[in-house]
């Protein structure tokens, strides 16, 4: 098996070279993964797909870091509900996170009812002086943090629901 791979990858002894430059093997040997890369772009975010494809570290030179970071954080947090990854990209990406909220149709449709309730909770907590209420009137940082917290809470509730649904399905199977 290893012989055929080396032959497909290049010319005879260049198998050693392929070990150092893996970018050469996927293109000639397996043309199929390109569609998988496109799926990665759509499904998991640009950052992951670029890291898997030939571009790798070059991508950071021409892709603005903030958009890659925000896409990565969205994709990783959908798998694990911890909010640790969310706080960092928000501080660097400026207003981009806000634009994500407006253009993301899933956020509105999936958690529409929950979102309304959460807005009420946020309003009441601000009125009660929950620390950030003093500065939230003017500073965009607080507005961004509120959005980040809302999205983190929304993600947690969504993942919790998915877990519960999965448990129900498991129970049905048993």
From Swiss-Prot:
Record localization: Secreted
Biased composition (Low complexity): 66-78, 147-161
Coarse class of the protein's main subcellular location: secreted
Region (Disordered): 1-174
Keywords, in A-Z order: Plasmid, Secreted
Gene Ontology cellular component list: extracellular region
Positions with biased composition (Polar residues): 50-65
Source organism, top-level taxon: Bacteria
Composition bias type Basic and acidic residues, residue spans: 79-89, 162-174
Entry function: Probably involved in host-pathogen interactions.
Protein name: Protein PopB
Annotated source species: Ralstonia nicotianae (strain ATCC BAA-1114 / GMI1000) (Ralstonia solanacearum)
Classification of source organism: Bacteria, Pseudomonadati, Pseudomonadota, Betaproteobacteria, Burkholderiales
